[in-house]
C-alpha cells in the first residue's frame, strides 16, 4: 500500500535491533484516516473470504483491527495481555513473547466471545517474528474457529513471522512488506 509506505518513509524511524518506530501514526498516536484506509485495503485483500469476526491483540492491533471490522461490518475481539479483575469467566490463554519489549505475556480472550466454527480474520500492527500471531492462532484453535487469513499493517519479512504464517497454510497479506533496514533506511519488498 503505497500510502502506508510513503508514511513510513516520512515519519518512521529505524532503531537499533531492527525495530521500526512508527509512533506518530500507529503505535502511540493513531492517524484514524490512515487506519481507515488500511481497513479498506484489508477488506479488498480478503474479499473472497467469509469473515464473521476480526481478532487482534492489544494495544497497537486495536486501531487497524477496529477499522477493518468496521468496514467489514463485523465485531472485533482483542486479546488482552492481562486478565482484568472484571473478567471472571473462562478464558482462552496463549503465551506470547514481545520482540520490542523483550517480555513474555500471556494473552487471553474470554471464551464466550469466540464460537466454534466462526471465521476469523486476524489483524496485527506488525508481524516480525510472528509471536502475537502465533498466540492468536493458538487461541483461535482452542475456540475451534476457522482462520480465514492474517493481515499485517507492516511485515518485517526478514524476521520469519510471515513465513511461519504461510507455512501453516494461512492466507497472509501485509500492507507494507519490509525486506531490510540498511543504513537507517527502510527497504520495502513486494512480497506479502
Swiss-Prot record:
Keyword field: Cytoplasm, Glycosyltransferase, Purine salvage, Transferase
Gene Ontology CC terms: cytoplasm
Any one GO MF annotation of this record: xanthine phosphoribosyltransferase activity
Presence of keyword Zinc: no
Enzyme class: transferase
InterPro entries, A to Z: PRibTrfase_dom, PRTase-like, Pur/Pyrimidine_PRTase, Xanthine_PRibTrfase
Intracellular or extracellular location(s): Cytoplasm
GO terms under biological process: purine ribonucleoside salvage; xanthine metabolic process; XMP salvage
Main subcellular location of this protein, as a coarse class: cytoplasm
Pathway the protein takes part in: Purine metabolism; XMP biosynthesis via salvage pathway; XMP from xanthine: step 1/1
Domain of life: Bacteria
Binding site for xanthine: 20, 27, 156
Catalytic activity: XMP + diphosphate = xanthine + 5-phospho-alpha-D-ribose 1-diphosphate
Enzyme Commission designation: 2.4.2.22
Amino acids binding 5-phospho-alpha-D-ribose 1-diphosphate: 128-132
Subunit field text: Homodimer.
Reported function: Converts the preformed base xanthine, a product of nucleic acid breakdown, to xanthosine 5'-monophosphate (XMP), so it can be reused for RNA or DNA synthesis.
Family to which the UniProt record says this protein belongs: Belongs to the purine/pyrimidine phosphoribosyltransferase family. Xpt subfamily.
The name this protein goes by in its record: Xanthine phosphoribosyltransferase
Organism listed in the record: Lactobacillus helveticus (strain DPC 4571)
Gene coding for it: xpt
Amino acid at each position: 500500500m503505497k500510502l502506508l509506505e510513503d508514511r513510513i518513509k516520512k515519519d518512521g524511524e529505524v532503531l537499533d535491533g531492527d525495530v521500526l518506530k512508527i509512533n506518530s501514526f500507529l503505535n502511540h498516536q493513531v492517524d484514524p484516516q490512515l487506519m481507515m484506509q488500511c481497513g479498506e485495503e484489508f477488506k479488498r485483500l480478503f474479499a473472497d473470504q467469509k469473515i464473521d469476526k476480526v481478532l487482534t491483540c492489544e494495544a497497537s492491533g486495536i486501531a487497524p483491527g477496529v477499522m477493518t471490522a468496521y468496514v467489514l461490518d463485523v465485531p472485533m475481539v482483542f486479546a488482552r495481555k492481562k486478565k482484568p479483575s472484571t473478567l471472571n469467566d473462562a478464558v482462552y490463554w496463549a503465551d506470547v513473547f514481545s520482540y520490542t519489549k523483550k517480555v513474555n505475556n500471556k494473552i487471553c480472550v474470554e471464551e464466550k466471545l469466540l464460537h466454534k466454527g466462526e471465521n476469523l480474520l486476524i489483524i496485527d500492527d506488525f508481524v516480525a517474528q510472528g509471536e502475537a500471531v502465533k498466540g492468536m492462532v493458538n487461541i483461535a484453535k482452542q475456540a475451534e474457529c476457522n482462520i480465514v487469513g492474517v493481515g499485517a499493517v507492516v511485515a518485517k519479512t526478514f524476521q520469519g513471522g510471515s513465513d511461519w504464517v504461510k507455512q501453516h497454510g494461512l492466507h497472509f497479506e501485509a500492507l507494507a512488506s519490509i525486506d531490510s533496514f540498511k543504513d537507517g533506511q527502510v527497504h520495502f519488498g513486494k512480497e506479502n
